[in-house]
């Protein structure tokens, strides 16, 4: 129960994935944003399984790999922030495609918040007397997916809710600048 609460709080608080989901909802609507939502949940579920199961210890014991993930992830997130800021208005929601399932799944592996959440969970919620590392890690991954789906949907729906207010080009531009700036700020807060 403690981990589920942790997972809900981690999944619903602002961060790069939720900003991406909000932008997906605002620019393409809920239905076209669902693959992005499922990708975020899948990526975090896999990460929550693999990091506690052993990948995390490899990354933490290899400073160069950790540094590459740290700075490479930050660079990618800043690039994504720039793409959000500079995205132009298209004619219809049907023409706007948000980040898809695979992109959102892979995105979790370069998202600094995802690494912080999964390594924190590994250190906090794995217990030697609670069973094998594999079974505990599988439970963490499954529970995180259960928490991430409704939590991420809140952000996706929020974006879709503001979509009607963004028909005006000036408002859409301001919204995209704010979303991109928030993503860049989240990178700065996590990295430095």
Write out the residue ranges for each language-model feature.
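Juxtamembrane transmembrane-helix termini in multi-pass membrane transport proteins
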Residues: 1-67, 120-140
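Hydrophobic/aromatic residues within the transmembrane alpha-helices of Major Facilitator Superfamily
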Residues: 8, 12, 45-46, 53, ...
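Hydrophobic alpha-helical transmembrane segments in multi-pass integral membrane proteins
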Residues: 48-52, 110-122, 181-192
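Selective transmembrane alpha-helices of multi-pass membrane proteins
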Residues: 61-89, 151-155, 164-192
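Flexible cytoplasmic inter-helical loops of multi-pass small-molecule transporters
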Residues: 86-100
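Anionic-ligand binding region
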Residues: 96-105, 111, 122
């Amino acid at each position: 129960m403690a981990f589920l609460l942790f997972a809900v709080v981690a999944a619903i608080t602002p961060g790069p994935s939720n900003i991406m989901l909000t932008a997906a909802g605002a620019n393409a609507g809920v239905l076209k944003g669902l693959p992005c939502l499922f990708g975020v949940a899948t990526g975090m579920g896999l990460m929550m399984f693999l990091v506690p199961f052993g990948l995390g210890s490899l990354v933490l014991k290899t400073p160069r790999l950790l540094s590459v993930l740290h700075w490479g992830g930050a660079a990618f997130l800043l690039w994504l922030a720039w793409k959000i800021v500079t995205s132009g208005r298209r004619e219809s929601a049907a023409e706007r495609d948000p980040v898809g399932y695979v992109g959102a799944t892979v995105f979790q592996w370069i998202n600094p918040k995802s690494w912080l959440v999964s390594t924190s969970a590994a250190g906090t919620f794995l217990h030697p007397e609670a069973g094998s590392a594999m079974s505990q890690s599988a439970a963490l991954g499954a529970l995180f997916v259960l928490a991430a789906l409704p939590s991420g949907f809140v952000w996706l729906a929020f974006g879709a809710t503001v979509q009607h207010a963004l028909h005006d080009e000036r408002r859409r531009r301001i919204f995209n600048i704010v979303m991109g700036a928030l993503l860049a700020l989240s990178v700065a807060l996590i990295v430095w």
